[in-house]
């Protein structure tokens, strides 16, 4: 990868221990030409902010599947700003317990400052394409992911 590849920081926030989704998204982003810093599961907001600053991230992608993303993400944008990070922010997963109306959940996260909000049903390619759009990245390679090859 070249030094000009867009850089993303990726992780599962708070006490959420789900890591399979971010691992698959990591692969899809790398195949699409991104430099990825995967923080893994159970990542604190301060770790996202520090990593984004340290790696001069173009985007910060936050995953949460256990339904408590609103509580876990509260204050994330303040911490990013305090660290001098001006990056696109994306959140996705099962963001709210008993989530039935995704549009309401999406609006809540947009009001928190997220540039893109995705449900757990969103495919990895759609997320990669949205990040490319947000960062105005030219097509570099297909965004399909082949596992086990």
Swiss-Prot record:
One of its GO terms (biological process) is glutamate catabolic process via L-citramalate. Residues 5-138 form the B12-binding domain. The keyword Isomerase applies. It catalyses: (2S,3S)-3-methyl-L-aspartate = L-glutamate. The keyword Signal does not apply. Pfam families: B12-binding. Pathway: Amino-acid degradation; L-glutamate degradation via mesaconate pathway; acetate and pyruvate from L-glutamate: step 1/4. Gene3D superfamilies: Cobalamin-binding domain (3.40.50.280). Heterotetramer composed of 2 epsilon subunits (GlmE) and 2 sigma subunits (GlmS). GlmE exists as a homodimer and GlmS as a monomer. This is Glutamate mutase sigma subunit.
């Amino acid at each position: 990868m070249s030094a000009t590849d867009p850089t993303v920081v990726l992780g599962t926030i708070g006490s959420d221990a789900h890591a399979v989704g971010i691992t698959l998204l990591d692969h899809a982003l790398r195949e699409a030409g991104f430099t990825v810093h995967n923080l893994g599961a159970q990542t604190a907001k301060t770790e996202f902010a520090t990593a984004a600053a340290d790696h001069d991230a173009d985007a910060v992608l936050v995953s949460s599947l256990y339904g408590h993303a609103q509580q876990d993400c509260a204050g994330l944008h303040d911490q990013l700003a305090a660290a001098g990070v001006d990056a696109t922010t994306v959140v996705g997963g099962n963001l709210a317990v008993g989530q039935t109306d995704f549009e309401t959940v999406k609006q809540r996260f947009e009001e928190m400052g997220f540039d893109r909000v995705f449900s757990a049903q969103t495919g990895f390619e759609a997320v990669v394409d949205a990040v490319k759009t947000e960062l105005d990245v030219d097509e570099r390679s297909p965004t399909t992911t082949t596992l086990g090859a």
